[in-house]
Amino acid sequence: YGSIIVEATEDLTLPAAQLIGTVIEGTHLIINNERVCRETLLRACCGQFDKIYPSAVPAQHQALMPADTLPLTSNLSPLTYNGSAVEHPLVYIPVFPGTNCDYDSAKAWRKAGAEVETTIFRNLTGEDVLSSIDEMVEHINRCHILMFAGGFSAGDEPDGSGKFIASVINNQKVGAAITALIDRGGLILGICNGFQALVKSGLLPYGKLGMVTPDSPTLFRNDINRHISQMVTTTVATTASPWLRGMQVGDTHSIAVSHGEGKFVVNEALAKELFENGQVAFRYADPMTGEATMEAPHNPNGSYYAIEGIISKNGQILGKMGHTERWEEGVFTNIAGNKLQPLFDNAVRYFRKK
């Protein structure tokens, strides 16, 4: 059934343990007294098909900041909740065809102290779609937080993922319920596929529906033209949101990403506006320096200006590609960096008014 490789600081005396080698300094291996460079092994393993399936490509867009961008105030104060304090805010997660991060998301919310409700969006028949829309509206009208979880909605339908969810969001009934949620101080979160839907519906970066134009930002295929699944480092770029409460500009986190279309594409004029408004929430960063970067694999998809996540102008809506919900104690233990990104705790604290 396979074996487990364990690195230990002392000899293991377990009956089935077998010593296979010792760790040495440098980037080479010594096997049967023959010294082999790590780069040679990587080329032998990956070089044959690297031209067809590259593991990394030079960034197609190199600028780290739009020209003439005014500096952002280091730490902006997020808005506060004007309603009555809620000890256990209600989170609603609609589960669409292809959503696959709802369990992890619900678990993370419950751990943070929220109550969670989920519903299945059924699309087998027209009647199923209509009843699912009515069910969504009912839950959105009762919830404090609306989350669109990650996945591959409708199998990442042709010519861009997230369109199925975006079409539901733009339904007149659903859209009215979402607008009412925003007006009463509610929060909205979209991760990965959910981020794609927020962007393609106009909720990000505009904060309301019906604003999408040909010049609007979008999320496009990764530069390597295939799915990526890895850990990345992101750096905090603003604090102007309840989601980012307690963070400081420059803080870094180690976050899992898994997507085929995560490249944030935006024109220079709108990017300048996003930076100056404090709407760029997170950026891909070099783990050694903590500085934003366009270089792969640290910026795994080639996102313009190294943007990983953005917020609406009022800070109530956050969208990001990294799967913050996938970390818990005992996971990613061999990955360096701060893996606790307290988005869920911050949202709960916002409603508790603490």
Label each residue range with its predicted role.
Residues 9-90, 98, 107:
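Intein/HINT protein-splicing elements and their conserved insertion hotspots or analogous self-processing inserts
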Residues 1-11:
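Short cationic amphipathic helices and targeting signals
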Residues 74, 79-161, 171, 244-245, ...:
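Extended, subdomain-level signal for the structured scaffold at the beginning of enzyme domains
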Residues 131, 135-138, 177-180, 211-354:
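Amide-donor transfer/coupling interface in amidating biosynthetic enzymes
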Residues 12-35, 117-123, 216-219, 225, ...:
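Beta-strand->loop->alpha-helix junctions that form or flank phosphate-binding loops
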Residues 7-9, 20-23, 32, 94-96, ...:
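Generic beta-strand/beta-sheet core signal
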Residues 149, 153-240:
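Cysteine-nucleophile active-site neighborhood
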